[in-house]
Design a protein with these regions (language model features):
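Conserved C-terminal helix/tail region of periplasmic/extracytoplasmic solute-binding proteins
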Residues: 360-393
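Early extracytoplasmic/lumenal segment of secretory-pathway proteins
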Residues: 51-124
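Periplasmic-binding protein-like
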Residues: 227-236, 275-299
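C-terminal motif of bacterial Sec signal peptides marking the signal peptidase cleavage site
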Residues: 18-21
C-alpha cells in the first residue's frame, strides 16, 4: 500500500516534516495552535486558509468546515478533491490523542465542526452532551457502512456517528533487537529489554496493557484491579524498563531502528513496515484492544451543513479505498473492504500481501480475543487521571 508515495513519505519522515500539497495544522496540546502549518514555512494566519478557526455559517460567503483528527490519518489528496468538488475550504487540524482532544474542548481553545475520536471517548462526549445528532438524510453513504460497525456500544442507537476507521492495538517489535518472537504483554514489563521499550502516552492504553497482562478486563470497574495495573506500570517505569512514552515519537523511533519494543496501532505498524521490514506486529496471547474511530459533529458547530457534506464524502467507497491504501487503517465501508485486494492489484500490478491485509483488517478470530474500550464512570476516570499523574510526579 502507498507504494506510490512510499519514497516521498520516507524522506519526509527523515527530515522531520510531513510534506503535502494541502495544509494540515498540528495543534499544541497545551492549548492554542503551534503557530505553523505543517509542511509549510508560512506562520499560521499568513496567506493560508487552514490557519483560521473562526467558523462560518456557510451562507452569503465562503463556506468552510473545521476538522480535528489524528496525525497522518488521511490521504490529503482527498481534502483537495473535496474542496474542488464543493468549494468548501477544509481547515484540517491534528491532535495527538483522545485525551488531548477532550482537554482542548474543555478549555474552549478549539472550535471544531467535525471530530474523529475513538469509541470510548465518543461515549463520554455523548454522556456530557458535546455532540449533536446527525441528519443521516444528508449522509446517504452511511448505507455503505457495514452493519457490524453500526449500533455499537459507544453509540447504541446510531444517532451521533459515522465510523471512519477501525483497527487493533498490539506490540510492535524489532526482530533484530529481541532474542525471540514476542507473544505476551510480559515483554512490556520485563527487564530483558530494559531501556529499549516505549508505551503509548495515554492512561487508557498504558493501564490497559497491564490489566490484560494481569488477566483483567480493560473495562474493569474494580478499583483494586486498576490500582494493580497502575502499580505494574509504575514499577516497570522505576526499574528503567521504558525508554519513555509517546505518540508520534513511537512511529519515528520504531521505524528508525532506535527502540526494540513499543505498544502501537496496527495501521501505523504497516506504515512503519513499509520502510523497515525488521519490524513485526503481534496481538498478545492475553488479548488486546480493538477500536473504532468515528466522525461526529460538535453540538456548537458553526458549519453544520458543510460538516455533513464532509462526513458523507469521507464515507464514500472511493474515499475509503484511497484512504485505507494511504493510512493502512481498515475501512468500515463494506464495499471498500471487500474490493480492496482487487483494487490494490489493479493499482500496483501485483497481488496484495494477505498477511499484511489481515493485520490491517483483523479477522474475527483475532477480534474475538480483543475488547473495545467502554466509557468509565466519572469516579474511575478521575482515578485513572490521578494514578497517571502520580506515575510521572
Amino acid at each position: 500500500m502507498k507504494k506510490i508515495v512510499a519514497l516521498t513519505l520516507a524522506c519526509a519522515l527523515a527530515a522531520g516534516l510531513f510534506l503535502s500539497a494541502c495544509s494540515v495544522e498540528k495543534v499544541d496540546p497545551n492549548g492554542g495552535d503551534d503557530g505553523f502549518v505543517s509542511g509549510s514555512d508560512t506562520p499560521a494566519g499568513e496567506n493560508t486558509p487552514a490557519a483560521t478557526d473562526t467558523g462560518n455559517t456557510g451562507s452569503g460567503g465562503n463556506r468552510e468546515v473545521t476538522v480535528y483528527s489524528w496525525g497522518e490519518y488521511i490521504d490529503e489528496s482527498l481534502i483537495q478533491e473535496f474542496q474542488d468538488q464543493t468549494g468548501i475550504t477544509v481547515n484540517y487540524r491534528t491532535v495527538p490523542s483522545n485525551e488531548e482532544l477532550y482537554s482542548l474542548l474543555q478549555q474552549g481553545s478549539i472550535s471544531p465542526d467535525v471530530i474523529v475520536p475513538s469509541d470510548y471517548m465518543i461515549s463520554q462526549l455523548i454522556e456530557e452532551d458535546w455532540l449533536q445528532p446527525l441528519d443521516y438524510d444528508q449522509i446517504p453513504n452511511f448505507e455503505k457502512i457495514a452493519d457490524r460497525f453500526k449500533n455499537l456500544s459507544y453509540d447504541p442507537e446510531n444517532l451521533y456517528t459515522v465510523p471512519y476507521t477501525w483497527g487493533t492495538l498490539g506490540i510492535i517489535y524489532n526482530t533484530t533487537m529481541v532474542d525471540a518472537p514476542i507473544t505476551s504483554w510480559e515483554a512490556m514489563f520485563s527487564d530483558e529489554n530494559a531501556g529499549n521499550v516505549l508505551f503509548i502516552d495515554n492512561s487508557r492504553d498504558a493501564f490497559g496493557m497491564a490489566l490484560m497482562y494481569l488477566g483483567y478486563s480493560v473495562n474493569t470497574t474494580n478499583e483494586d484491579e486498576i490500582r494493580q495495573a497502575a502499580a505494574l506500570v509504575a514499577d516497570a517505569w522505576d526499574r528503567g524498563v521504558y525508554q519513555g512514552k509517546g505518540m508520534d515519537e513511537i512511529f519515528n523511533l520504531m521505524e528508525g531502528d532506535n527502540v526494540a519494543i513499543a505498544t502501537y496501532y496496527a495501521g501505523d505498524y504497516l506504515s512503519m513496515y513499509e520502510n523497515n521490514e525488521n519490524l513485526a506486529y503481534v496481538i498478545p496471547e492475553e488479548g488486546s484492544n480493538w477500536f473504532v474511530d468515528a466522525m461526529c459533529i460538535l453540538k456548537n458547530a458553526k458549519n453544520v451543513d458543510e460538516a455533513h457534506e464532509w462526513i458523507n464524502f469521507m464515507a464514500s467507497t472511493d474515499a475509503n479505498l484511497r484512504n485505507m491504501d494511504y493510512i493502512w487503517y481498515a475501512s468500515p465501508n463494506e464495499e471498500a473492504l471487500e474490493m480492496y485486494p482487487e483494487w490494490y492489484e489493479e493499482q500496483y500490478g501485483e497481488p496484495l500481501d494477505m498477511d499484511l491485509y489481515e493485520i490491517m483488517a483483523a479477522p474475527q478470530e483475532v477480534l474475538d480475543r480483543c475488547e473495545a474500550y467502554l466509557v468509565m464512570p466519572q469516579e474511575l476516570r478521575t482515578l485513572y487521571n490521578d494514578l497517571w499523574t502520580e506515575l510521572f510526579a
